[in-house]
Amino acid sequence: MLKMGVVLFIFLVLFTLATLQLDADQPVERYAENKQLLSPDERRDIILHALGQRRCCDPDWCDAGCYDGCC
């Protein structure tokens, strides 16, 4: 009887946990696939934003939001 309980525990609990872990990975993969379609300029903007850096602005409308070394 104990052996059957162990087998049921393995299949009902551990197998379920293993499959739930795989399902959690899928949204990240879809997000990564969407990011591969970006142009190099869009990709650079995302990276600079994540690093907290700013791009150079056009000299015509340079303001406080621009990077200091640009204007």
From Swiss-Prot:
Its main location: secreted. Expressed by the venom duct. One of its GO terms (molecular function) is toxin activity. This is Conotoxin VnMLKM-02. It comes from Conus ventricosus (Mediterranean cone). Disulfide bonds join C56-C66, C57-C70, C62-C71. It comes from the Eukaryota. Residues 1-24 form the signal peptide. The cysteine framework is III (CC-C-C-CC).
